[in-house]
């Protein structure tokens, strides 16, 4: 089956035909920044028209929370005016093909899980440490999306009850400590301020302040991993994102994991899919749901 896959992010919308896990005719446009609701309707309509007659179903990976086809977020400000946007209905105006939607981190998780031996790894987690911290959870070989679409928002578990206020409104979330945004919140206040990329450059040069800041992030992720393993019996975790894949970061996470009893640990690896993980994962997931639900019922 041919899939029109869409990956909707805060700054870009990627689209491609996905067939047998291969991406064709990929294009990318900017996410609307002005008149965002009407702009998004128009952008989706144009993308559907561009690929008309070339797909059998539509799969969407999107930032935020997808619940009954509606786009929302723990922090609505992250959507730039698109909170409560009728994403599925907007797409359905332009096609009668089946449509499936899920969160972009959930989609990336499903893509990464395709690389695993499901007989050996039935419980799997993907963690992305980037501007924010997100992820997805596979239990008993099934991607967990939840009744409200929020399953896998692991960046909003507690890291420090006395920590900074997170964008979601809660104090001390993992995201408020480990993310690129959290790193920059500290480094931008230094006498010699810098962005997260330079923080890691200084870290690799053994700068004391940068090292402490990166270690703080890595410790939070190590504790998150331990919590996931002990609560869900996770067998393997893949880590991605611009922070998660930064040179030296994963080894720090593994170092802090070694301080825990072994029962809190599992195999850790770097994520293999890059920027197209959402496109590929969404295409695979919706196809699998279609096969499992012959009547055509699609989640999202």
Curated annotation (Swiss-Prot):
> How does this protein assemble?
Homodimer.
**Protein name, as recorded:** N-acetylmannosamine kinase
Q: What are its E.C. numbers?
A: 2.7.1.60
Query: What keywords are annotated for this sequence in UniProt?
Result: ATP-binding, Carbohydrate metabolism, Kinase, Metal-binding, Nucleotide-binding, Transferase, Zinc
Alphabetized CDD domains for the sequence = ASKHA_NBD_ROK_EcNanK-like
Named from the GO MF annotations, one term is: N-acylmannosamine kinase activity
Give the reaction(s) catalysed: an N-acyl-D-mannosamine + ATP = an N-acyl-D-mannosamine 6-phosphate + ADP + H(+)
| Residue positions binding Zn(2+) | 156, 166, 168, 173
Q: Please name one Pfam family that this protein belongs to.
A: ROK
Q: Which family does it belong to?
A: Belongs to the ROK (NagC/XylR) family. NanK subfamily.
Q: In which pathway does it act?
A: Amino-sugar metabolism; N-acetylneuraminate degradation; D-fructose 6-phosphate from N-acetylneuraminate: step 2/5
InterPro entries referenced in this protein's UniProt entry, alphabetically: ATPase_NBD, ManNAc_kinase_bac, ROK, ROK_cs
Q: What class of enzyme is it?
A: transferase
Q: Does the keyword Zinc apply?
A: yes
Q: What does this protein do?
A: Catalyzes the phosphorylation of N-acetylmannosamine (ManNAc) to ManNAc-6-P.
Q: Which Gene3D superfamilies match?
A: 3.30.420.40
- Single Gene Ontology BP term? N-acetylneuraminate catabolic process
Residues where ATP binds: 5-12, 132-139
Asked if ATP-binding is a keyword of the record, the answer is yes
